[in-house]
Amino acid sequence: MRCFKAIVAYDGAYFLGYAKQPNKLGVQDKIESALNALGIKSGVIAAGRTDKGVHANNQALSFHAPKHWNAAKLFHYLAPKLAPHIVLKKLEEKNFHARFDAQKRAYRYLLTKNLKTPFLAPYIACGDYGSLDALNIALKQFIGKHDFSMFKKEGGATTNPNRIIFNALAYKTFIMGHECVVFKIIGDAFLRSSVRLIIQACVQYSLEKITLAEIQAQIHNLKATIRTPIMANGLYLHRVYY
């Protein structure tokens, strides 16, 4: 058997998350079904599991295939079976583990105050976010190593809640005629819905609905003020570093 590394982009609006689902509507279901149709019976490991509605620009995967498959041949046959909602961007033979070998994961979140067309609703979140300066003040609180037990949703199998945030910032840009705030968060790994809970906390602080002290208390596991993640549709797994 040969081990392959794949880089894929997918539209999270068409799936119930990355992981397998009972109704077969997970990204993993689609990819494994496509491989199965080619006679490749392999589980697919991802660098990170995205929630329902969350997109990926460069999700990294690892899987095995029989030795008669090479990267060029497999790309030729696999890519059409994944389209249109999953795009196979790169495929190479590489002995690695997509999850355990990953060093950093980078996420982006797109948020606009005024969405001018419903056709972008699955891809850009819409809502007030206050001031850019306040967002960056809040984001700085998360940089470093922390126990993120109070910044995760229930259901994850992780036993170690400690994670490192290397960089967290927000900046403004224009995307398809919309002024957006882009949140950029890079960490070694993230707990379930942690990125969306972090962004929600920053937005609520910027809107003066919570204080910086309340964010710090939640980071230190003293009291959870933010329990509901921000909407999923603006979030993208942007890049995985190895």
Curated annotation (Swiss-Prot):
Any one Gene Ontology molecular-function term assigned to this protein's record: RNA binding
Residues at the catalytic site: D51
Domain of life, per lineage: Bacteria
UniProt-listed Gene3D superfamilies: Pseudouridine synthase I, catalytic domain, C-terminal subdomain, Pseudouridine synthase I, catalytic domain, N-terminal subdomain
Keywords, in A-Z order: Isomerase, tRNA processing
Residues bound to substrate: Y107
Reactions mediated catalytically: uridine(38/39/40) in tRNA = pseudouridine(38/39/40) in tRNA
GO biological process, one term: tRNA pseudouridine synthesis
EC numbers, comma separated: 5.4.99.12
One Pfam family per UniProt: PseudoU_synth_1
InterPro entries: PsdUridine_synth_cat_dom_sf, PsdUridine_synth_TruA, PsdUridine_synth_TruA_a/b_dom, PsdUridine_synth_TruA_C, TruA/RsuA/RluB/E/F_N
Broad EC category: isomerase
Family per record: Belongs to the tRNA pseudouridine synthase TruA family.
Complexes and interactors: Homodimer.
Purpose: Formation of pseudouridine at positions 38, 39 and 40 in the anticodon stem and loop of transfer RNAs.
NCBIfam families: hisT_truA
Protein's name in the database: tRNA pseudouridine synthase A
Gene: truA
